[in-house]
Amino acid sequence: MHRASLICRLASPSRINSIRSASSYGNNTISATPLVQQRKQSVAASVKHEPFLNGSSSVYIEQMYETWLENPSSVHTSWDAYFRNVEAGAGPGQAFQAPPSVAYAGSMGVPSAPITSAAPATRLDTNASVQSISDHLKIQLLIRSYQTRGHNIADLDPLGINSADLDDTIPPELELSFYGLGERDLDREFLLPPTTFISEKKSLTLREILQRLKEIYCTSTGVEYMHLNNLEQQDWIRRRFEAPRVTELSHDQKKVLFKRLIRSTKFEEFLAKKWPSEKRFGLEGCEVLIPAIKQVIDSSSTLGVDSFVIGMPHRGRLNVLANVCRQPLATILSQFSTLEPADEGSGDVKYHLGVCIERLNRQSQKNVKIAVVANPSHLEAVDPVVMGKVRAEAFYAGDEKCDRTMAILLHGDAAFAGQGVVLETFNLDDLPSYTTHGAIHIVVNNQIGFTTDPRSSRSSPYCTDVGRVVGCPIFHVNVDDPEAVMHVCNVAADWRKTFKKDVIVDLVCYRRHGHNELDEPMFTQPLMYQRIKQTKTALEKYQEKILNEGVANEQYVKEELTKYGAILEDAYENAQKVTYVRNRDWLDSPWDDFFKKRDPLKLPSTGIEQENIEHIIGKFGSYPEGFNLHRGLERTLKGRQQMLKDNSLDWACGEALAFGSLLKEGIHVRLSGQDVERGTFSHRHHVLHDQKVDQKIYNPLNDLADPQGEYTVCNSSLSEYAVLGFELGYSMVDPNSLVIWEAQFGDFSNTAQCIIDQFVSSGQSKWIRQSGLVMLLPHGYEGMGPEHSSARPERFLQMCNEDDEIDLDKIAFGGTFEAQQLHDTNWIVANCTTPANIYHLLRRQVTMPFRKPAVVFSPKSLLRHPMARSPVEDFQSGSNFQRIIPETGAPSQNPPNVQRLVFCTGKVYYDMVAARKHVGKENDVALVRVEQLSPFPYDLVQQECRKYQGAEIIWAQEEHKNMGAWSFVQPRINSLLSIDGRATKYAGRLPSSSPATGNKYTHMQEQKEMMSKVFGVPKSKLEGFKA
C-alpha cells in the first residue's frame, strides 16, 4: 500500500503546470471539476512512466504545490527548493535525482547524486534537500497509514478478547521501522502535511505525532473512511476526529449520558427481576445503544430533522420503546401479562411490536415524531420497509432532500454481514426514485450470532464491510467508552446532514446472556462467557469515571438511581391494573383521520364520466410538438386514439384510465419494478424517450391537468426482496394513494417471499396495519418454460384467511356481502381478463373505505389479444369491478341444454373459447370466468350453478393439478353444491414438480389434452388447434 517507489517519484513539470492552471482557475479558487480534467490529461500522457500518479501521494503533492503557490514560505524549505527547481524547468528526476525507497526491515537510504544545472540559482545542498523531502514523505506515509489502518489495532473489544477485524496482527506500515525510523527520531520535529489536523501547530515531534495518531485512531474508536473517493469527505471526517479536544463532553453532557445509561441498564435489570423466565431479548452488554440512538435523534433534531423512522431487530426493542420512544412503561409491562386482547388481530410477540409517538425533544426543544416499524423475526427484512416509509413521508411533506425525515436502522453483526437484503437495500441509496438521502446504521456488534463465532459467519474482516460498497464511512467504537460513542453519533448525524449519504456506527459490545434469557451460552462460548461474568456493566464503569472526574458525587448518583427505580415500580403497579391489551397501542403507521365518517360496508362506484375517458386517452395517445418520438411508438400512440374511436380499449388503456382518473382526483400513483416504465412486454410506454436528445423524456400521465396527483413510474434495481419491501413501506404512509409493484415475471416474485409472507399477507392481523399495495404478477402458460409461466397462485391462495366452508343457513348473500368479505379478508387475489376489470380493480383499491393488499395475476399475451378488449361503456359511471364474468354467448340463452358449466380464471378462458369453437361445443359448454379468487364470490358462483342446474360442473385451469387455484376453489364450490348432491370435477394438467414444461411440443400436447378433458372430446378432434 505504502510503497515509496511509487509515491516518492514527484510530479513532472507538465503535471505541475496542470496543477498551476487548475489552482489559478477562478481567481485562485480551486475548481474540482477542471482539476480532475487536468489530472486526467496529465496522467494520460505519462502514466506509463509515472506510476505514482495513481497513488495517494499525487493528492499530497498537489496540496503542497497549491500551498506553495499561495505562499512559498508556508512550506518547508526542502519543498520550496524542489518547486523552485521544477518551476525553473527541471524535468522529471532532475529536481532531485535520488528518490528514497522504503524497505520492510529497514532504512530509507538516499544515494548521493549531484543535482543538474537546470536551476543553478536556487540549488540547495543535494543531500539535505533530498533527505528533508524523504523525511516529509515518511511522515506523510506514516500519518496516512494510521488514517487508513489505525482501526485495525484500535482497542474495540470491551472484553479484551477479540480483534474486531478478526486479525490480531499489527499492519507493518504502522511500525516506525517500516519507514526507516526509530527511537532516535522520536524527538525530531517534522512538518505536518496538509492531509492531517492532529495539531494546530505546523510541526510536531515524531513522539507527539505518534501519540496523537494513536489517541485518535487506535484507542476506543476505529475510523474507516479512506475508502471514500471524495477528498472533501475525507478531510471533513479528519477534522472531526483529529482536531485536538474535539471529542470532549461538557459536565452537563456527561450527566445526561449518565442518566440515559441508568435508564437503559436499570430497565433491563428490572425486567430480569420481575420476569426471570420470560424471553425479552434484552440489551445487556450494549446498554449504550439507548444513549446512542437518543444522541443521534438529539443531534439530527437540532439539524432540522423532525421525523425519525426506526427499523430494528428484536434485541433491545423493549428498551428502545421505553427509553427512546417513551411508550408508557405500564403499557409495555402489561405485555408480560396473560391478558385478553381488546380489539381485532392476532397480535405479535412483544419484541416485534412497533409504535409511533410524537413528543418534545428536550435537547433541541422541537417536536419530533418517532416511529419504530413492527417487524418479524426475519432479520434485516424491515430495512427496505423503513426506507420506503421514509421516502413516502418525505414525498408527502414536500421534503425533497429528506432534510426533515430520516431512517435509523439497527442491525446485528451476524445479520448485517449475512443477509442479502442488506446489500439490496444499500443499492437503493442513490437511485433517484428510491433514495432517502442517507440513513444512519447502528450495528449492535455482539461479536457472535446466536451461537456462531464471527469467523464462521463472515468472510470479511468486519461485519460492516458491506457498507464500503456504497461509500459509507464506518465508525467502530468500544461500548465501554460511552463518551466516544456520543461523539461518533454526533459525527454520524452531522455527516448525514452534510453529505446526504449513509453512515455506519459499529457498537462493538457483547451479549451478557445467551441468544435469549433462557439460553445457555456456555455450551458454545465458554471462555467468552467466563470473561463476561467478570465484566462490569458500562454503567458501573462510567459511574466510576464521572465520580473520579468530579462530574458528579455519590449523592447525585444515588438520587438518580433511586428516581428511576421508583418510576419503574410505579409503572409495574399500574401495569397490574390493566385488564386487557390493546393492539392499537402498537400502531407504527396510524391513519386515524382516514377512517372517520366512512361506512366500512359501502363500496362506491368506480366508473368515470365519458369526457374524462376521452381526455385521458387523448393525452395517453399524444406527445408534445418538437418531441422526437420513435416511429414505432408513433404508431402505438395513434393506435390508442383509434381504439377510443373504435370503442375497443386494450390493457394499456385500461391501466392508463385507472391511473389517469385517480391522478386527476389528486391521488398520488406510484408504479415501481423492473422495466415498468416501458413494461416487460412493451405494452405500457408511460415514459417516452426523445430519439435525438439524451435524457429528454415525456410522461403523458403527468401532463393531464393542473393541479393533479403526481405519477411516479420508476424502473427499479434488479431486486425483488428490497424493492417490494420498499413499496410496502411507501404504501403505509398515506392511504390516499395507489402504490403498485410489478414483477418482471410473476415467477420471480418468490425472491421476495419473506416480504410477502411476513408483511403483506399477515401484516394487518399481526400489527393492525393496513396497506393498499398492489402486486402485479405476470402469469400465464404460453410455452415459455418453467421460470416464465407461473406466479404460483396456489401459494398466495393458501395464505388467504377465508374459510373454505360456508354455512348457507347462516350466510345472507346480497346487500353488504361483497363489502363484508373485502373488509374481513387479509388480501385480495385476482386474475383479471379484461382491461375494464383491471381498471375497476385498481380504482377500487383507493375508493374502498379501508385498505387491503391486492395480488393480481396480470397477463402477458392478453396485452395485445384481439379478444381482450373492453368497450368504453365498461369504464363509465355506474360500472364496477366484476368478481365473475358469466357466459354471455349461446349457452346463456338456453341453460337447460348446457351439458357442462366450466369455471376458470385468467388467460386460459381465451384458449377455451378458441377450443370450444374448434370442437363445435359453442352451444353445449358455458364458460364462466372467476376474476376475483379471494374473497371467493360464493354468491355469484352459486347463481351460475343454479342457472345451469343440469350441467356437469368443471373447474378448468392451465396450471398443474397440484398448483393453480384448484385446491382453493374445489372445497368452496363443493360447499355450495353439496346441498344438491353435486360436486365439481377437475380438468387440466396432471400434478408436477415443475411449474411448466420447457418443450414447446410438450406444451402444445398438454394444451390439447386439457381441452379434451374440458369439452369431453377425443384428443383427435383437437388436431390443428393452436391456443
Curated annotation (Swiss-Prot):
Disulfide bonds: none annotated. The keyword Transmembrane does not apply. NCBIfam families: 2oxo_dh_E1, PRK09404.1. Keywords: Glycolysis, Magnesium, Metal-binding, Mitochondrion, Oxidoreductase, Thiamine pyrophosphate, Transit peptide. It catalyses: N(6)-[(R)-lipoyl]-L-lysyl-[protein] + 2-oxoglutarate + H(+) = N(6)-[(R)-S(8)-succinyldihydrolipoyl]-L-lysyl-[protein] + CO2. Gene3D superfamilies: 3.40.50.12470, 3.40.50.970, Multifunctional 2-oxoglutarate metabolism enzyme, C-terminal domain, TPP helical domain. The 2-oxoglutarate dehydrogenase complex catalyzes the overall conversion of 2-oxoglutarate to succinyl-CoA and CO(2). It contains multiple copies of three enzymatic components: 2-oxoglutarate dehydrogenase (E1), dihydrolipoamide succinyltransferase (E2) and lipoamide dehydrogenase (E3). PANTHER family: 2-OXOADIPATE DEHYDROGENASE COMPLEX COMPONENT E1 (PTHR23152:SF4), 2-OXOGLUTARATE DEHYDROGENASE (PTHR23152). One of its GO terms (biological process) is generation of precursor metabolites and energy. Its EC number is 1.2.4.2. It is found in: Mitochondrion matrix. Belongs to the alpha-ketoglutarate dehydrogenase family. Its main location: mitochondrion. This is 2-oxoglutarate dehydrogenase, mitochondrial. Its cofactor is thiamine diphosphate; Mg(2+). Homodimer. Component of the 2-oxoglutarate dehydrogenase complex. It comes from Caenorhabditis briggsae. GO terms for molecular function: metal ion binding; oxoglutarate dehydrogenase (succinyl-transferring) activity; thiamine pyrophosphate binding. One of its GO terms (cellular component) is mitochondrion. Thiamine diphosphate binds at residues 315, 413, 446, 448, 674. Mg(2+) binds at residues 413, 446, 448.
